[in-house]
Amino acid sequence: MRFTRIDWANVMFSDESRFHIDSSDGRARVYRHPGERYSDACVVQRTRFGGGSVMVWGGITCHDRTPLYVIQGNLTAVRYRDEILRPFVLPLIQAPGRNVTFQHDNARPHVARVVNEFLAHNNVHTLPWPAVSPDLSPIEHVWDEMQRRLRRQANQPTTLPQLSQALVQIWNDIPQATLSHYIHSMRRRCRECIQANGGHTSY
C-alpha cells in the first residue's frame, strides 16, 4: 500500500488508552521549617494501590478530532459500536465532502462480527493494520503528550472523576497543528518500519 501525504491526511486514527491516578514514582518534595513535619501543609496524602485508572477513546484527523470519550467498565464489541462508532466516528466520516478512511487496531472489540457488519453497512472503509504495532499509530504520541501535560498540572487529580475531567480538558487543549504534525509523520513511520523489517523504530 503506497499512501501519499494527502492519503494519510484523510485517515482517522483512533485508539483507547488508560491513565492512572498517582502515576508518578510516588515521591514528593516538601520544604518545611523545623517542627512542621506533621503540619497539614507539609503532609501529602497518598492514594492507595495507584488510585485507580480511567480508560478513554479518541480519534484524530489532520483537520479535526472526536470528543474524548471516557469508557466506563469493560468495552465490549456492542458497546464499541453503540457508544463510540455510531455517535463519534460515523458523523465525522460521513460529513459532506469528506472521504475519510477509518483506522483502529486489532483489539477484540474492534474486529468482532457485529462491528465489521456495522462498518460495512455504513460504507466505512477501514485501514488494514498490522498486529502489535503501536509505534505506527500517531495517536500514541497524543497519549504521550496528554500524560506529560497531566504530570505538569499543579493540582493533580486525586479521584477518578477529577482525572476524567482533566483528560477531557487536556485533549481539547492540544493544538490541531500538533495532531496534524503527528499524522504527517506516517510516511516516515512506515519507511522506518520497513527498514527495521517490522521491528522497533524511533517512534
Language-model region placement:
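Surface/interface recognition patches
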Residues: 1-203
